[in-house]
């Protein structure tokens, strides 16, 4: 089991950790659409997403994932995610960090959350956002 990895440290990253780090980089550099497209390019066709902002909704397949996040963007919602720790255990990559949701009305919420990325055969099978995991 690998221990925590500081975001931005590139030594000894597994391919799965690299996909996750590159997704957060794409979000900060190119926006939400770029991050989603990067992650989907490394996903199985039947990938499942359970976004933190999805109120329990489970998205299945790239089309549902794209439609959900396109709807967020088109509504004027801005999502900013910042990883603080990344840990790998087998085929799972766990990220603790913060998510800021800025609503078109001007209201916002910032939460400390965790993301879990489950890989199968080197491709993403499942991504979930939820309450922060203990470190």
Residue ranges and their predicted role:
Residues 1-41:
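Short, low-complexity N-terminal intrinsically disordered segments enriched in polar/charged residues
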Residues 2, 112-135:
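Short beta-strand edge/turn micro-motifs at domain boundaries
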Residues 20, 35-39, 47, 61, ...:
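Hydrophobic pocket/interface hotspot
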Residues 36-89:
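A solvent-exposed, acidic/Ser-Thr-rich amphipathic alpha-helical stretch
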Residues 43, 99-101, 115, 130-131:
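Short beta-strand segments enriched in hydrophobic/aromatic residues
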Residues 74-77, 101-110:
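Short, cysteine-centered beta-strand-loop-beta hairpins and adjacent loop/turn segments enriched
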Residues 79-82, 96, 108-115:
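Short, surface-exposed coil-to-beta transition loops
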Residues 88-99:
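A short hydrophobic beta-strand element
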């Amino acid at each position: 089991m690998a221990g925590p990895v500081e975001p931005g440290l590139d030594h000894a990253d597994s391919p799965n950790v690299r996909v996750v780090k590159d997704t957060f980089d794409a979000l900060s550099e190119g926006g939400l659409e770029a991050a989603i497209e990067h992650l989907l390019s490394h996903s199985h066709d039947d990938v499942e997403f359970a976004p933190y902002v999805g109120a329990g909704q489970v998205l299945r397949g790239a089309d549902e994932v794209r439609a959900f996040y396109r709807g967020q963007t088109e509504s004027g919602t801005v999502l900013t995610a910042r990883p603080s720790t990344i840990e790998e255990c087998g085929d799972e990559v766990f990220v603790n960090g913060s998510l800021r949701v800025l609503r078109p009305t001007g209201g916002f919420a910032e939460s400390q959350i965790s993301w879990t990325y489950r890989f199968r055969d080197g491709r993403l099978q499942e991504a979930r956002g939820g309450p922060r995991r203990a470190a």
